[in-house]
UniProtKB/Swiss-Prot annotation:
The gene is BAP1(2). This is Mating-type pheromone BAP1(2). A lipid is attached at C45 (S-farnesyl cysteine). Activates B-regulated development. The keyword Ribonucleoprotein does not apply. Transmembrane segments: none annotated.
Length: 48
């Protein structure tokens, strides 16, 4: 689980550096894993 969580965390951190939320806009599954309810509700992301 650590390897998967770290991989997802790195992807999200890379996007957060820009100060944007492209993950939410693209309905990326990473949003569900990250636990950002605001993104999940707005984009209707399905939990994986």
């Amino acid at each position: 689980m650590r390897s998967r969580a770290s991989a997802e965390g790195i992807a999200v951190l890379g996007l957060r550096r820009r100060g944007e939320s492209p993950v939410c806009r693209r309905r990326n599954v990473v949003v569900c894993f990250w636990g950002d309810r605001s993104c999940v509700e707005r984009e209707g992301c399905v939990r994986g």
